[in-house]
Amino acid sequence: MTAGMGHSFRRNMKWALGPLPSARYWLGVEAPAWAQVVAGSEEIVGGLLGEEGGAAGAIVFTTKGVVALGPEGEVSTQFSYRDMGRMGTLSKDSGAPCEVPVTLSDGRLVVLRVGPPIGVRFAVATYLLLAWDVWRGRS
């Protein structure tokens, strides 16, 4: 991963998440061991820690897609960037982000906000901006 990619990822995460502490999200080179297990053979681009700071409720971004984890650290939802890219194109046509609600296995709701493609090599920076809409038990 290039330094520019890391900068774009952090900038996009800050834009999407607002004023959260930087420790809440990390780049691939800082990925915890459990994130590599989730990603398998895919390269990790970055991620967002769950409520307790570990695998529970976290989201891992790889070069091929997004993996959302449930309360026990199990995989609850997966998206490919190809699917997210289609939604990003719809977003470009409408001028507003597409919002994709994802319900984790413990009932918490995460809203993935997909913006239009911006011409960056990696799909994370190109298609996906993540926002925690409902994270602390609200639905």
What is the predicted function of each stretch?
Residues 11, 15, 36, 86, ...:
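Charged/polar, solvent-exposed surface patches and flexible loops
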Residues 6-8, 118-139:
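Terminal and domain-flanking low-complexity segments
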Residues 18-20, 31, 70, 96, ...:
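Intrinsic-disorder/low-complexity coil detector
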Residues 1-59, 108, 113, 121:
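Anionic N-terminal interaction surfaces
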